[in-house]
Curated annotation (Swiss-Prot):
The keyword Cell inner membrane applies. It is found in: Cell inner membrane. It catalyses: UDP-N-acetyl-alpha-D-muramoyl-L-alanyl-gamma-D-glutamyl-meso-2,6-diaminopimeloyl-D-alanyl-D-alanine + di-trans,octa-cis-undecaprenyl phosphate = di-trans,octa-cis-undecaprenyl diphospho-N-acetyl-alpha-D-muramoyl-L-alanyl-D-glutamyl-meso-2,6-diaminopimeloyl-D-alanyl-D-alanine + UMP. It comes from Burkholderia multivorans (strain ATCC 17616 / 249). The keyword Signal does not apply. This is Phospho-N-acetylmuramoyl-pentapeptide-transferase. Keywords: Cell cycle, Cell division, Cell inner membrane, Cell membrane, Cell shape, Cell wall biogenesis/degradation, Magnesium, Membrane, Metal-binding, Peptidoglycan synthesis, Transferase, Transmembrane, Transmembrane helix. It is a multi-pass membrane protein. Pathway: Cell wall biogenesis; peptidoglycan biosynthesis. One of its GO terms (biological process) is peptidoglycan biosynthetic process. Its EC number is 2.7.8.13. One of its GO terms (molecular function) is metal ion binding. It comes from the Bacteria.
């Protein structure tokens, strides 16, 4: 919004050229989202408390968690407000990637909000059924996947439509330009052509998978938000490189026109996340709930797809991957042993993984900070793929 205003008034005030610089707008988006979160946080927490949207705590979990019962949840709305305002103020609203990421983020946010609302207001511990939640995630994820399949390699929506029609005329058999290939880290001249169907399948898996992985990780005070901020910031760096014809050529990456604008979104997400951490750090005054976790995970997955860094997201988001695998392994092994031996057996003391470490004697803050440190190291490793190729 401010970019368009600056471009309109630029002839009358040369200093407004500052608003055309992507890095300046990224910094301002961070500050804006951070400020909104810090200022509006107490009001949002107070309103959530008045609504009696307290978090229910598992009685079979760590006993130290029982004191968390009743802490306001659905605090993810605070993050989404910060992201929305900062992105709309400082982003280029003609950029198609901004809108598709916003669609996924807020679409998944609505799913999470409905789930949270049913749990805490209607006192239904099940919330949305797994089938219902997965259905709506799939609708949004598939829509984004189909659109991105034809837009990642093209400069504007006219060319996106032309590419789509060419695919239809080919009998749905035509491939995609090389810029839509799956990039392999550390290999500068080797990529894997996915084709349209492969791209759609991978994108769907990344977006929906990332959303649910972040949601599973959200179980301790401050645990999930800092990894989201770190991974989001790292993806913002990739977006800046991919969106720049100069830097992408120098680093031997495919140039993706318009991708650089995602730095604004990632910066807004970082600022909003840090503001939320102010109130979510131990002992938490508010939890983000599904409304925040599903939305942020979907956002990370979508940005990773656009900048063609799905594998790097898997690396940098290693904590999310480990948490998800711990649940899958625990459930699978329990069902298998129950069927074979008549009693269910566990691999971990409790899943997701962070609860296993708690029950192993780690304090909550130790688990959280150590997971942050691991994520920081993984993000630095992921960023190293920019040059080590």
């Amino acid at each position: 919004m401010l970019l368009a205003l600056a471009q309109w008034l630029q002839g009358d005030a040369s200093f407004l050229r500052l608003f055309t610089y992507l890095t300046f707008r990224a910094v301002m988006a961070t500050i804006t989202a951070l400020g909104i979160g810090l200022v509006c946080g107490p009001w949002v927490i107070r309103k959530l408390t008045e609504m009696k949207v307290g978090q229910a705590v598992r009685k079979d979990g760590p006993q130290t968690h029982l004191v968390k019962s009743g802490t306001p949840t659905m605090g993810g709305v605070l993050i989404l407000i910060g992201i929305a305002v900062a992105t709309l103020l400082w982003g280029d609203l003609t950029n198609r990637f901004i809108w598709i990421v916003m669609l996924v983020t807020f679409g998944f946010g609505v799913i999470g909000w409905v789930d949270d609302y049913r749990k805490v207001v209607y006192k239904d511990p099940r919330g949305m059924s797994s089938r219902e939640k997965y259905f709506w995630q799939s609708v949004i994820g598939l829509f984004a996947a189909v659109y991105l399949a034809f837009s990642v390699s093209e400069a504007n929506n006219v060319r996106v439509f032309d590419l789509f029609m060419a695919w239809v005329r080919s009998g749905l058999s035509m491939g995609l330009p090389a810029r839509a290939d799956l990039m392999l880290p550390f290999l500068k001249s080797i990529s894997y052509p996915l084709g349209v169907w492969g791209f759609i399948a991978l994108t769907y898996f990344v977006i929906v998978g990332a959303s649910n992985a972040v949601n599973l990780t959200d179980g301790l005070d401050g645990l999930v938000i800092m990894p989201v901020v770190l991974v989001g910031a790292s993806l913002g760096v990739f977006a800046y490189v991919m969106g720049s014809a100069v830097y992408s050529k120098y680093l031997l990456f495919p140039h993706i026109p318009g991708a650089g604008e995602l730095l604004i979104f990632c910066s807004a997400m970082g600022g909003a996340g840090l503001a939320f951490l102010w109130y979510n750090t131990h002992p938490a005054q508010v939890f983000m709930g599904d409304v925040g976790a599903l939305a942020l995970g979907g956002a990370l997955g979508t940005v990773a797809v656009i900048v063609r860094q799905e594998i790097v997201l898997f690396i940098m988001g290693g904590i999310f991957v480990a948490e998800t695998l711990s649940v899958m392994l625990q459930v699978t092994w329990f069902k298998y042993t129950k069927k074979r031996y008549g009693e269910g057996r566990r691999i971990f003391k409790m899943a997701p993984l962070h609860h296993h470490f708690e029950l192993s004697g780690w304090k909550e803050t130790q688990v959280v900070v150590r997971f942050w440190i691991i994520t920081l190291m993984l993000c630095l490793f992921g960023l190293s793929t920019l040059k080590l190729r």
